[in-house]
Design a protein with these regions (language model features):
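Short, basic/glycine-rich phosphate-binding loops at helix/coil junctions
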Residues: 6-7, 64-69, 118-126, 205
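Surface-exposed, charge/polar-rich loops and edge strands
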Residues: 91, 124, 132-134, 140, ...
Length: 258
């Protein structure tokens, strides 16, 4: 069975421990897709100079944030890795263009979502880093090379946010106004249109040239997982948005292909 492709807007790390509309949305996602034999995650929180693939048998849970409650730092997501799958992914990308790494594990872009989707942590998970040195077109080509994994029971996932401006979020948290600003609404709508029409060129052009792009993403790390999942999808795949809405200026939109 061919697996779908999924992008998730992960939002605040607190979604990992709070019962809210976003965590309930994450929990519901697993019911929309067949159970995968493994998961390949592209998280906006592993942004590197080079292309790396986790090659650990037992990846650690990384708490890559600060200033949050102790309860959040206590969360563990003990899913196994899969070294053989990591090697297979490296071959698909190109062994001359990628490396296995044992220096990373599961960052919060991964485990804050997966602990709701698959709480037993019994599905192997591999993380793929986002290479900061690549052009948008090169990211697209790399992501396309991952598509055969779908026919091998692997769920390809991206985790970021359609809009992600931490400075603006912090500013907004000091005010009583929870409504998303116009630039966030406009960029979210542009992404929705590009993925619905399967217009990859328009999607690539959205950063940094789209409406409100520099406000939506001062840096591209949380935007690129959207591109990876769009590229791994097939033009014949149905496109759905199982989670929509805003947490202040963060778009929490999720995108399911297939």
């Amino acid at each position: 069975m061919r697996m779908p492709v999924l992008f998730v807007g992960h939002g605040s790390p607190m979604n990992a421990i709070e019962d809210n509309e976003w965590s309930r949305g994450f929990r519901s996602l697993s019911g929309l897709i067949p159970r995968p034999r493994a998961i390949l995650m592209v998280s906006g929180h592993w942004y590197t100079n080079g292309t790396f693939i986790t090659g650990n048998e037992r990846p650690e849970t990384i708490h890559d944030f600060y200033g949050f409650p102790r309860e959040l730092f206590a969360v563990q997501y003990p899913a196994p890795g899969d070294v053989d799958l990591a090697r297979q992914i490296r071959k698909l990308i190109g062994e001359d263009r990628s490396e296995l790494s044992s220096e990373w594990g599961f960052d919060h872009g991964t485990w804050t979502v997966l602990r709701w989707m698959y709480p037993h942590a019994d599905i192997p998970v591999i993380q793929l880093s986002i290479n900061a040195k690549l052009t948008m077109a090169e990211h697209l080509d790399l992501a396309k090379s991952l598509a055969p994994l779908r026919d091998d029971g692997v769920l390809i996932m991206g985790s970021g946010n359609v809009t992600h401006n931490l400075r603006d979020l912090m500013r907004q948290m000091q005010t009583p106004d929870f409504s998303p600003p116009d630039w966030a609404l406009n960029f979210d709508e542009a992404v929705k249109k590009a993925v619905t029409t399967r217009d990859r060129k328009s999607l690539i052009d959205l950063w940094p040239n789209g409406p409100g792009a520099r406000q939506a993403h001062p840096t591209p790390d949380h935007f690129l997982p959207i591109l990876y999942t769009a590229a791994a999808a097939d033009p014949a795949d149905q496109v759905r948005f199982p989670i929509e809405g805003f947490d202040r200026s963060f778009s929490m939109r999720s995108i399911l292909y297939g």
